[in-house]
Amino acid sequence: MKDQIVFKFPDKSFYYEEDFCVGENNYEAYKLIKEWPNWSFKGINIYGPKKSGKSYLTKIFSDKAKSKIFDSKNINKNNLDLILSQNVLIIEDIDFFSDEVFFQTILNDFISKNKFIYLTSNKLSGSISFKLKDLISRLNSLVTVAIT
């Protein structure tokens, strides 16, 4: 054999909306993402167990909103300007946010500018063991959608 044929397969890190499988366990969240930016609210928390499709839905939303996805474990003062420059705040895994004051500061900035907020977590945002009452209040004001 003189020439080897090389097949180029797509990168597995790509999430294509047309490949997303909508079912009763994620229908409500998917429907809300499709309706954005015509929401009657400014913030959402999509929560559910690991491997339930939160990251896939978040990628679909991020593409639609043209905003960057931030992982709560990687958010710090070094990327604050980039975070605040987004049209929509998209943070995954807020359960693991270690600096509550910093998190609240970011949320307050987006709320004061009437920008959209999209958060994911493993459990309902209001039931995460945060200590700051104002942060808990902000999180409790979000629309929440469970996926399984």
What is each residue range found by the language model?
Residues 1-35, 40:
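A short, basic N-terminal segment
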Residues 20, 29, 46, 110, ...:
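Conserved RecA-like P-loop NTPase ATPase core
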Residues 41-58:
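Walker A/P-loop nucleotide-binding motif
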Residues 57, 61, 102-113, 134-138:
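Catalytic-core regions built around general acid/base machinery
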Residues 62-73:
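Post-Walker A helix-loop "phosphate-sensing" segment adjacent to the P-loop in P-loop NTPases
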Residues 82-106, 113-122:
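Conserved P-loop NTPase "ATPase switch" module shared by AAA+ and STAND
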Residues 125-140:
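Short regulatory helix/loop adjacent to the ATP-binding pocket of P-loop NTPases
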Residues 142-148:
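Conserved AAA+ ATPase "SRH/arginine-finger" region at the nucleotide-binding site
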